[in-house]
């Protein structure tokens, strides 16, 4: 069998500069003006950052980077990756206490941060005496100086003449930690870049010079891998959205063809289109879409959470393909990717970089882009793999003969009834997706009974004149129960006055089954 290989980030930058040259790669708004950076310029500035870092220390360092997705963030992340050091990205809203703990666990020696984190960065210097370097990313003038002083024409030019071991760790990404302590996923260059070297089932999504709007944070592998690494390979323009408050404005300014989203964003944008059509019935669907998305939108690629198939249908009525993929950081990112010929209820088709099997209902993955492990957590790493080396995703699913993947729940969330039957709470929760009275729902087991805890959409109830919310929800559940499997029958509806408790990443916290 041919050994799996993939280019390094440096090789991607070199190829991009050679192939696409002065074509625009990165666009962003600064001080009210649109600025552009070509493939050549991004390569040049990334190499300058690489030389700057190596001029500070020839020792391999773990470098934390805290900030929003701006141009300096991207060149720093690239510079770290091509310098042979290890990038460790964090969310900009991380607390000082958590950052100090994770810095210690991840052996951080250098911190790059944006202006908004400056005060906390000073506190971290006191809490983390092992930090050797700390640099503010928000200082544009400082970075322009780095780009110039460490250019290919400078005395430091030779510092970028290095060969990176593609099998060594290049990035550590901490998982959200919905259960227990956060774990640092170690990925190699081979995993990071190799994961995007798959065959696109939809050949018209990623074409050179197409415009992609990047709205999700770069510290998530879904965004960095898709909006940066893959678009660098394919020659797309990447427009940086910045704040979510600017999304609607920037959609109309940049007029993208493709946007990577989470389902919540897709739902919100759809509601805007519907509001325009409701306000003026004379407005055409095409014009309403253009008022929200601009004139070129064709694709929304969803990930990170369950996507209601009804939402897919709604978007197709607008002439937009909304499709989802599936992945996890531990697999290098993608496991399956969008395909507009696949079932709307699937998460696309498994990539040709991955092999998937279903063992006892669980989706398990074999891929050369799998993680090296959890940093300094050998026992936790071992638990993630089967005896024959397959990655355990923890998701329950089905795989068809034509490689379509379907997810039905989580292994850890299974409700095990006294008769031994396993019930996926997610499968029941999905049945509430079309009920406008339901804002949030959590299904769990309690003494061999299925409970549905619901936070209603009180605004909707008010508009529709629904006074007996409990009664209305019980009627809806009765209708569901008539066609449900015996094990899926909901015994009780509990109505909440407050939203369900969430994790740091915005996911609903699960309750343990009470036996």
Summary of predicted features, one role per range:
Residues 118-166, 273-291:
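ANL superfamily adenylate-forming
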Residues 437-443, 448, 478-515:
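Conserved C-terminal "lid"/linker of ANL adenylate-forming enzymes
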Residues 193-211, 218-288, 296:
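Conserved AMP-binding/adenylation subdomain of ANL enzymes
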Residues 257-261, 269-342, 439:
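Gly/Ser/Thr-rich phosphate-binding loop
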Residues 36-40, 170-196:
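Conserved AMP-binding A3 loop
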Residues 21-24, 152-174, 181, 205-211:
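Conserved pre-ATP/AMP-binding loop-to-beta segment of ANL
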Residues 35, 50-94:
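Conserved AMP-binding/adenylate-forming
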Residues 350, 357-358, 362-417, 422, ...:
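Conserved ATP-binding/catalytic segment of the ANL
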